Amino acid sequence: MIAIVDYNMGNLASVQNAFAKIGTQTVIEGDPKKFKEYDKLILPGVGAFGDAMEHLRERGMIEAIKEFAASTKPILGICLGMQLLFESSEEFGEHEGLGLIKGKVVAFDTSKFEETLKVPHMGWNRMFTKEHPLFEGLDEEHYLYFVHSYHALCDDEKDSIGRTFYGYEFTSAVAHDNIMGIQPHPEKSHDNGLKILENFTKYRNLK
């Protein structure tokens, strides 16, 4: 069974509905003591990094998520949820993240943008992916739906499994062992997004 983490900052119903479209039952779970009962966790998120970490902290979820990760069960972060997997973010100050993937989250460097580009990065864009179980059955290059003003920088480029170009190339999907994340919204990305969610439901950690 897959749990969608409810920390009062996310598009929980739309994520759950997306899983329902592929025939997968999920539970919206707000009790961190129950996380260990599930096979997989989804960490969604919409909003500011610092607020999200505070919500997780208030609910006692930070250690529960870290313990789940240490058990080698799969975790998928979506949009802000992916960013929370990193060590820190510079969004509205410096904020500590979950530290499950080494690296940080930074603002788009608009000095590298053409005049026509704006922040946030919003709309359909291509993701170029490495071979990974999340992308099985998808082309190496496929369109997904993005809404974000900050992006991840991986300390280890091996953790970057998806790249997208918006003014410059940035990491749009990550994976380190059982920890995975995607910056775009699969629940808004039609068939390509549903395929990623389906692949996550089938994912089996190798450890």
From Swiss-Prot:
Pathway: Amino-acid biosynthesis; L-histidine biosynthesis; L-histidine from 5-phospho-alpha-D-ribose 1-diphosphate: step 5/9. Residues 1-207 form the Glutamine amidotransferase type-1 domain. It catalyses: 5-[(5-phospho-1-deoxy-D-ribulos-1-ylimino)methylamino]-1-(5-phospho-beta-D-ribosyl)imidazole-4-carboxamide + L-glutamine = D-erythro-1-(imidazol-4-yl)glycerol 3-phosphate + 5-amino-1-(5-phospho-beta-D-ribosyl)imidazole-4-carboxamide + L-glutamate + H(+); L-glutamine + H2O = L-glutamate + NH4(+). Disulfide bonds: none annotated. One of its GO terms (molecular function) is lyase activity. Keywords: Amino-acid biosynthesis, Cytoplasm, Glutamine amidotransferase, Histidine biosynthesis, Hydrolase, Lyase. It is found in: Cytoplasm. GO terms for cellular component: cytoplasm. Its EC number is 4.3.2.10, 3.5.1.2. Heterodimer of HisH and HisF. IGPS catalyzes the conversion of PRFAR and glutamine to IGP, AICAR and glutamate. The HisH subunit catalyzes the hydrolysis of glutamine to glutamate and ammonia as part of the synthesis of IGP and AICAR. The resulting ammonia molecule is channeled to the active site of HisF. This is Imidazole glycerol phosphate synthase subunit HisH.
